[in-house]
């Protein structure tokens, strides 16, 4: 694989309809199999939903809980179908269970529905919770729209301080009854914070605070970028004011230029 091919593939995906990112990504992987692994790990796509066979609870699927054709359930901790895929250490699995219960409450409060999942994996050797990584996934769908949040993070702990590096992506797809009208896109932001850690469970509270803050900012930015641009386009097609208002505004601008 050459860097030129990889960059060209990413450039192509950026120019295609984000609504069809999964289909376009699969097509590129078939055309250039040597790019598949890198593309699948670097391109965010809408999250899948499966039901845990053991608990009957829904969970989200992505590249972070996949091993071949199997996906690990955060509720049971097992792969479905069964496989010898990577799993977190005992201490980290205990933290993962707490994280899923906590973000399930967060999801219910902020999304009033949808599905959430949290997956953790060890960074260093041994059974510890001082250095680990993970991902927080949230998804809400309606008949014509969907919201997918993906928060990938790394945690390092030293002297009672936790360093959190988070890469957050929101994939938004808004539709309407008209098949010709839709709005799709994604936004990615990186965050790094240092927060106090008294015990391992404090990591979950800290991550919850970070995710809450980042999602609020991303929502506002999406509203400003996408809806603001759509409003500008509509304004260019049909102004809200009359012709006389436009002339008055033009005269005011000319007076201001003269004063300058």
From Swiss-Prot:
Stretches assigned to coiled coil: none
The keyword Cytoplasm is assigned to this record: yes
Gene3D superfamilies recorded: 1.20.58.570, F-actin capping protein, beta subunit (3.90.1150.210)
Main location group: cytoplasm
A cellular component term, taken from the record's GO annotations: mating projection tip
The organism's place on the tree of life at top rank: Eukaryota
GO MF annotation, one: actin filament binding
Gene Ontology biological process terms, A to Z: actin cortical patch organization; barbed-end actin filament capping; cell morphogenesis; filamentous growth; mating projection actin fusion focus assembly; mitotic actomyosin contractile ring assembly; mitotic actomyosin contractile ring contraction
Keywords noted in UniProt: Actin capping, Actin-binding, Cytoplasm, Cytoskeleton
Subcellular location as annotated: Cytoplasm, Cytoskeleton, Actin patch; Cytoplasm, Cytoskeleton
Family statement drawn from the similarity comment of this UniProt entry: Belongs to the F-actin-capping protein beta subunit family.
Quaternary structure note: Component of the F-actin capping complex, composed of a heterodimer of an alpha and a beta subunit.
Function of the protein: F-actin-capping proteins bind in a Ca(2+)-independent manner to the fast growing ends of actin filaments (barbed end) thereby blocking the exchange of subunits at these ends. Unlike other capping proteins (such as gelsolin and severin), these proteins do not sever actin filaments.
Protein name: F-actin-capping protein subunit beta
Organism: Yarrowia lipolytica (strain CLIB 122 / E 150)
Gene: CAP2
